[in-house]
């Protein structure tokens, strides 16, 4: 049985799901569930499980809450860590300080001027991902969006299209892109800046793999300053400022956050 905490609890309460014969409990993306406020739900699910069971916990980061789950609900756990190798010497990291109303124009300019392989453009909300993808298409760029608002079938088709090179630009949120293994990504664009260094590192780690060169480009406006300051607290990151090039100021056809206001994370 695979499900979100809320759906699992719903079935338990309606007695349409029984844990009586459960042997293995898997907590996937534990850090993300905790960040989204699901710790109480996760604990209720764990307490409903048989005491005699195997528990596996997967987490990209080990926060205090994840440690809490491990210590309280796991017996003599064994830790296994794995990460993709990114050659820092082959990863160029730069940022442009640009007014927010010119951010999309700069992105279009860079995508058209840079010689790239596959490109990932990160946004912090579903609506921004849709906004960017739809307007990139309007200006002749082959882009497609992926985020938590899409069905699993649609996400799978989107990823197949991107991996096959049928679409060269994937506009995505952090949640939707988690766990994806994509080869030949040459450029990462942060259209919206990460909220912390952990998210930033996850993003840029998708390029400069297996000895290949890669570039991470962040577009920083006033709404990104707070997150960017937190990212720069990590001394291991070498993000250099870049001078703004000459570029045409274009007008997006679809407004940012259209269809219900700015928001819709994931």
For every predicted segment, state its role.
Residues 1-254:
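Conserved helicase RecA-like core
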Residues 250-266:
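Intrinsically disordered, low-complexity RNA-associated tracts
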């Amino acid at each position: 049985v695979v499900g979100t905490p809320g759906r699992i609890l719903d079935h338990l309460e309606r007695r349409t799901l029984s844990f009586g014969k459960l042997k293995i409990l898997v907590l996937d993306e534990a850090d993300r569930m905790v960040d989204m406020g699901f710790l109480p739900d996760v604990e209720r699910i764990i307490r409903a499980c048989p005491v005699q069971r195997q528990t596996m916990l997967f987490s990209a980061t080990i926060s205090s809450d994840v440690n809490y789950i491990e210590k309280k609900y796991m017996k003599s756990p064994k830790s296994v860590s794995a990460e993709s190798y990114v050659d820092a010497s082959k990863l160029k990291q730069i940022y442009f300080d640009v007014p927010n109303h010119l951010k999309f124009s700069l992105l279009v300019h860079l995508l058209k001027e840079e010689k790239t392989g596959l490109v990932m453009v990160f946004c912090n909300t579903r609506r921004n991902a849709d906004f960017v993808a739809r307007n990139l298409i309007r200006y002749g760029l082959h882009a497609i969006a992926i985020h938590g608002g899409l069905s699993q079938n649609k996400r799978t088709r989107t990823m197949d299209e991107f991996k096959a090179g049928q679409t060269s630009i994937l506009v995505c949120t952090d949640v939707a892109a988690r766990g994806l293994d994509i080869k030949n990504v040459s450029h990462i664009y942060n259209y919206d800046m990460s909220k912390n260094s952990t998210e930033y590192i996850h993003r840029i780690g998708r390029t400069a793999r297996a000895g290949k060169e890669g570039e991470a480009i962040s577009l920083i406006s006033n709404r990104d300053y707070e997150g960017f300051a937190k990212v720069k607290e990590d001394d291991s990151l070498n993000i250099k400022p870049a001078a703004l090039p000459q570029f045409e100021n274009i007008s997006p056809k679809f407004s940012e956050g259209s269809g219900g206001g700015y928001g819709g994370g994931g």
